[in-house]
UniProtKB/Swiss-Prot annotation:
Top-rank lineage group of the source organism: Bacteria
Pfam families for this protein: TatD_DNase
Similarity comment: family membership: Belongs to the metallo-dependent hydrolases superfamily. TatD-type hydrolase family. TatD subfamily.
Major localisation: cytoplasm
Entry keyword set: Cytoplasm, Exonuclease, Hydrolase, Magnesium, Metal-binding, Nuclease
GO terms for MF: 3'-5'-RNA exonuclease activity; magnesium ion binding; single-stranded DNA 3'-5' DNA exonuclease activity
Annotated function: 3'-5' exonuclease that prefers single-stranded DNA and RNA. May play a role in the H(2)O(2)-induced DNA damage repair.
Subcellular location: Cytoplasm
Lineage: Bacteria, Pseudomonadati, Pseudomonadota, Gammaproteobacteria, Enterobacterales
Cofactor(s) the protein requires to work: Mg(2+)
Protein name per its UniProtKB record: 3'-5' ssDNA/RNA exonuclease TatD
EC number: 3.1.11.-, 3.1.13.-
Binding-site residues for a divalent metal cation, renumbered to this chain: 91, 127, 152
Length: 260
């Protein structure tokens, strides 16, 4: 199993990061993609990817941090992306839910990162919340120039999902789908994701699966819980968990070009 979304740079992991990685490996996780959400976090993620043989990282600026994007940021992201442990540009995209950066700042940073990914021929690791139409409008001109793209932590509608799949995007599914309050619609969409376009992730330390038992006292999510998410996704799709694990692993290798 490969976890395509781990925020291992989070302060929630500062005291036991080695143990978190050890527990993940013991739980059957064979690889992890560490998410970079701004320049500093991307640099830290790359250092952690160097430290742990089972980890790779992304380099990019999250829409929340898009106000930080400047020409110096771009130069630093490009330099970082040339490191062998960095296998995708992102986390980038649009988030019009809370607009921590203005829509204009988000669009500027997103388009710049799409251009970088195209120039470096690297896949993009993307985020979209309450911005689907504009997200696709900005992404569309770049699709034939990119080697691949994943929309991580998908929580949209069936129509939005189909529009993403029709454009060749991979779909990242998190423990959100295990939430009996807000994940039911996503759960119903699982069978409509082509197996060859499905990826799984924890988004740890966030999105602890609500149906996990026993729940950790800290309420912190970990990559070790990926097995639980995969088992639930396989159940709701009517597939064998081992087959789905092998299939999603193959998807990771295809999209990110890594061996694990």
């Amino acid at each position: 199993m490969f976890d395509i979304g781990v925020n291992l740079t989070s302060s929630q992991f500062v005291k036991d990061r080695d143990d978190v990685v050890t527990r993940a490996l013991a739980a059957g996780v064979s690889g992890m993609l560490l998410t970079g959400t701004n320049l500093h976090e991307s640099q830290q993620a790359q250092k952690l990817a160097q430290r742990y043989a089972c980890c790779w990282s992304t380099a990019g600026v999250h829409p929340h941090d898009s106000s930080q994007w400047q020409s110096e940021t771009e130069d630093a992201i490009v330099a970082l992306a040339r490191q062998p442990d960095v296998v995708a540009i992102g986390e980038c995209g649009l988030d019009f839910n809370r607009n921590f950066s203005t829509p204009q700042e988000q669009e500027r940073a997103f388009q710049a990162q799409l251009r970088i990914a195209a120039e470096l021929q690297m896949p993009v690791f993307m985020h979209c919340r309450d911005a689907h139409a504009r997200f696709l409008a900005l992404l569309e001109p770049w699709l034939d120039k990119l080697p691949g793209a994943v929309l991580h932590c998908f929580t949209g509608t069936r129509e939005e999902m189909q529009e993403c799949i029709d454009r060749g995007l991979y779909i990242g599914i998190t423990g959100w789908v295990c939430d009996e309050r807000r994940g039911l619609e996503l759960r119903e969409l699982l069978p409509f994701i082509p197996a060859e376009k499905l990826l799984i992730e924890t988004d740890a330390p966030y999105l602890l699966p609500r149906d996990l038992t026993p729940k950790p006292a800290s309420r912190r999510n970990e990559p070790a819980h990926l097995a639980h998410i995969l088992a639930r996704v396989a159940h709701w799709r009517g597939e064998d968990p081992q087959w789905l694990a092998a299939t999603t692993d193959a998807n990771v290798k295809t999209l990110f070009g890594i061996a694990f």
